[in-house]
């Protein structure tokens, strides 16, 4: 009986405690929340750090290249999520390629809006005005980039520049594309005004040059040539960017911060932010332990000019029996040339090459990159060299190259394209194009006789 009374007393006490907790409405102190967050510089820094979660920026198979003529995948027109729905025209809004892009972009827009709406708390708490301006600029940058992407893919959009509930967002409908474009330019301008030219050793956050370059890309896509040319030129005139001497090295995981990377999201093996294992496995050739199933297309191979500057169907230098000879060097920096070493083996997809040299052991072994030996070797005989080296094998499956969103080569070529569209072709345009071409051949831009 006494025990029963004790239990009843405990239960009653717990009930009173629960009722008391409910009425007190205590704000949690162990996690960020909209009721108390954005009040200190530390909280603002943590908030903007979340803008650069890789999932907000990358695309399936690391980019939308799978949706172009540049790649092929052996299940491309069969498996959902492999890009086939784009290529065969069966894509709908319910497919992952579509709704994940829409969902992730609006998530980041919502984060940016929430910071901009609540940063007044930090201002009222006396946080350094220079820091406030910088944090705002990062939010404007994120919002501009994501609306720019959504406009490119979808046109008219629901436009939100403040926090909304889902029901409120559903009720506003779509805003015409033409009305949103100027708002995106305004956001980019706010970012340009508030971001630093450099973060010093820190490279995970966007700079003034990144905002200029992303504005130029958006303007180019929208056909606003004057805006694109000016934004690209402004980035060039900062004089903080340059091209790496070796094109192929730019994309390796061993290459860290370099002046060619205008905007990139860093990965880190130590922090478990790595390339998707699917991509690593399918990018490596079969002799190196991969599948060799996500490949460059023959369309891409054919796109590279010959060393005389002519396309393969016009150049007398092109030999269809030796398709890699006399080609722009970026061709073999991107696609593995037959008969050359790649990740420890001589790569030869020929049906006649049933044995291949293992360059690490010096011994001949069964050639799993020939379909005469392995049924599922590369279906078109091509595999990627770009970005892939021995470290992919040594660290498998943990590979962590930066996710590059904007390079200085992009800026130079965007400037040239915009000026050409304006019919304003001058020495600055030729210099921009020649700088990129010359780098491919490993010479100076002024040595025009050494490259086409």
Language-model regions, residue ranges each:
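An aromatic- and glycine-enriched ligand-binding surface/loop that stacks and positions planar moieties
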Residues: 22-81, 157, 189-192, 205-365
